[in-house]
Amino acid sequence: MSGNVASRFTDFRTSDGEKAWRHRDNEFEPATLTRAQLLQQWESAWAVMFREITALADDALSETVTIRGQAFRIDEALLRSLAHSAYHVGQIVYIAKAIRAADWQCLSIPKGMSEEYDRTASRENAAAHAAWLASRNQGSRGV
């Protein structure tokens, strides 16, 4: 994902989103990275994206950018990137759940806890929600 995000958002208003330096096919080859290296790649790519998005004015959303030679309005390109990233994050979560099995900690409301959660006022307060999830994840495998 980091290669895609970095490529798409580096100079994304002035150059094609598919950069020659990306070497996309190499991203699908097995690689051994430390956790620190992986996080560095991840954070670096997202920093590029956030820098570019932060610089956008509302009226720029209707401007056009190019991705693989195809023109997209900026708002369309952002939604396209969001959908693409969500797809891959889903894959990552699915694999992580399979690897961690019983040690998986739910990222939201654990399975079987919806009714209890709905009865609490914690859902109205972000800090209370986080505390509720943390307390439930201590003894729950979740989903």
Residues covered by each model-derived region:
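Generic short alpha-helical hydrophobic face used as a protein-protein interaction/packing hotspot
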Residues: 1-2, 92
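Short, helix-capping/interhelical loops that line the mouth of catalytic, cofactor-
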Residues: 2-52, 59-65, 98-143
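A contiguous, mid-protein "functional segment" used to position or interact
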Residues: 74-112
